[in-house]
Regions:
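Conserved catalytic core of two-component sensor histidine kinases
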Residues: 16, 43, 50
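Aliphatic-rich helix starts adjacent to a transmembrane/signal segment
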Residues: 29-46
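N-terminal single-pass transmembrane signal-anchor helix
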Residues: 2-34
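Short, contiguous, well-ordered secondary-structure segments
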Residues: 1-2, 55
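Periplasmic/extracellular, small/polar-rich flexible segments of pilin-like filament-forming proteins
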Residues: 51-147
């Protein structure tokens, strides 16, 4: 009688099959985790923008508009109607926020990121009247929503 140690071929095949089944279940669950994190950063940037705009309004009685990119560059920026000044705001990396000045009582903004290819891929927020909402998904003033 020989004293063999080790696994048989059947035992190894069973382990490989079990690992394959676990991978087939786990990979789809975690595949879009990065996109979800980017969408969360877009919503976070919009919340921070609401706070920055309200602080700006407190000082100037006006809102600012413009396009802000996550690389720290403000590509375009517009004064409020009263020309009160410009908003200092930098979104997260690779996020682009376009703020549309409507009037001294409101504005709207949308946020996008090229890393998001699925849906939702755009988030928005508004301040002022509901007609300012960038999309029907944006239902509450000052509360970001994605579509």
């Amino acid at each position: 009688m020989s004293n063999r140690k080790g696994f048989t071929l059947i035992e190894l095949l069973i382990v490989v099959v079990i690992i394959g089944i676990l991978a087939a279940i786990a990979i789809p669950k975690f595949a879009n985790t990065k996109e979800k994190a980017v969408v969360a950063s877009m919503k976070s940037d919009l919340r921070n923008l609401v706070t920055a705009q309200e602080a700006f309004f407190s000082d100037n009685q006006d809102y600012a508009g413009g396009t802000y990119k996550g690389d720290g560059t403000v590509y375009t920026q517009t004064n409020g109607l009263a020309g009160a000044g410009r908003l200092a705001f930098t979104p997260s990396a690779n996020n682009t926020i376009v703020v549309t000045y409507i009037d001294a009582a409101g504005w709207k903004a949308t946020s996008t990121n090229p890393a998001v290819v699925g849906t939702p891929n755009t988030c928005g927020v508004y301040v002022g009247v509901a007609a300012n909402a960038p999309n029907a998904a944006t239902k509450a003033e000052g509360a970001p929503a994605c579509w």
